[in-house]
Amino acid sequence: MLEKMAEFFENRLNGYDEHMMTGIEAADEFYPFTASLLPTAKGSRVLDLGCGTGLELEKYFPLCPSARVTGIDLSEAMLNALKKKFTDKDITLIVGSYFDVPLGENVFDAAVSVESLHHFTKDEKIPLYKKLHTALRANGYLILTDYFAATDDEEQTHRNNLNALKAEQGIRDDEFYHYDTPLTVQHETEALLEAGFASVQVP
């Protein structure tokens, strides 16, 4: 049974951090690694898409205590949990979809998204990435930490399974429910380049 995205995470808030750190492969490695790639200059402006409870920020703020972070998430409960962790930090939190929230122009030194963007098609991502590109300052960059489909067939299978479940439950295409539909690295790269990013580096 598919669940609406915000409700899915709110229903799992208790124990969420522990699940992410112990139940997701290599989480103890990719959260610190992601944080190490973010800017550390005093007052760096960082946008966190789908920030949840701020697990990546737990690793980032020790590296840049003066960072000014804007976090966007669908779940108000998740953001409230994040807020309690960082009462002394410069954080602006926005409840909403990062597809809909205005981001401005030349605002951020970097943007980051961890385990959040694997729910969307390439065509859905391109307008978002264009908006992100506009919101980044000169020499700004996006860090995307996520998992990807190994093959085109796997990517399409995820999408087909989602469409079948939506049809079974009578869910419209414009309704946002939780189901993983990761792209291949190649398709993700194509989306970023089409959106205007000059290059894509895969570690």
Model-predicted segments: where are they?
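Conserved class I S-adenosyl-L-methionine
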Residues: M1-T40, L55
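Class I SAM-dependent methyltransferase SAM/SAH-binding core
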Residues: L47-L49, T53-D100
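A short acidic, Gly/Pro-enriched loop at the edge of an enzyme's catalytic core
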Residues: L103-A111
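A short beta-strand submotif of the Rossmann-like class I SAM-dependent methyltransferase core
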Residues: S113-S116
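A short His-aromatic
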Residues: H118-F120
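A short glycine-rich, Lys/Arg-flanked "PGG" loop and its adjoining helix->strand segment in the class I
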Residues: I126-A138
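C-terminal alpha-helical "lid/dimerization" subdomain adjacent to the S-adenosyl-L-methionine
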Residues: T145-A195, V200-Q201
